[in-house]
Amino acid sequence: SSKKPQKPATKTVTAGRKASLTGPVVNVPVWRASTHLYENVAELEAGKGRNEDGRFFYGRRGSPTQWSLADALTEMEPGAHGTMLYPSGVAAIACSLLSVLKAGDILLMTDNAYDPSRSLADGFLKRFGVQTRYFDPRTTDYDALFCDRTRAILLESPGSLTFEMQDIP
């Protein structure tokens, strides 16, 4: 059956609804839990790592509330093929950088970046062979920053501590 396209306002209030997540209620209830109880060990083992099927295993891996929100955001964003939610900004930054960087690559990062992002670059990424080059966020010569090993650039505008605004070309 062909579904009539929804208006943006309708999509906003209905996106992410799945009967498998909502049960008899209209919207997914808010799950405030990190741990889920199982009737027996066999049920626990069957649930491990299977969040993709909508089965709650452990809060850090998501919950029906989070899956519903991710589905809703994907539905509302034209051309999106999936949404990832993270519990913190640095977790999102780490996942994004780890998805594109490999040993030998260079990461460009503004010198006013959030301290946990700098710690990630100077610690974790460095141990895996990724070099980070910091630059003045007020630069006007972005071309001079790049070389053949540059794989990613992390910009913060405004900067988290100094609030400099970058003029990104």
Language-model features: locations:
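Short amphipathic alpha-helix with an adjacent loop that forms part of the alpha/beta core around
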Residues: 139-150
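Glycine-rich helix-loop-beta junction characteristic of Rossmann-like nucleotide cofactor-binding loops
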Residues: 75-77, 98-101
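Buried hydrophobic positions in well-ordered alpha/beta secondary-structure cores of metabolic enzymes
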Residues: 24, 73, 92, 107, ...
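Short acidic-hydrophobic, aromatic-tinged amphipathic segments that line or gate anion-handling sites
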Residues: 132-138
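Conserved PLP-anchoring active-site segment centered on the Schiff-base-forming lysine
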Residues: 99-116
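N-terminal glycine-rich, Lys/His-bearing helix-loop that initiates the first secondary-structure elements
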Residues: 1-53
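Active-site core of PLP-dependent enzymes with the aminotransferase class I/II
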Residues: 159-169
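Conserved N-terminal alpha-helix of the aminotransferase class I/II PLP-enzyme fold
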Residues: 35, 40-91, 117-123
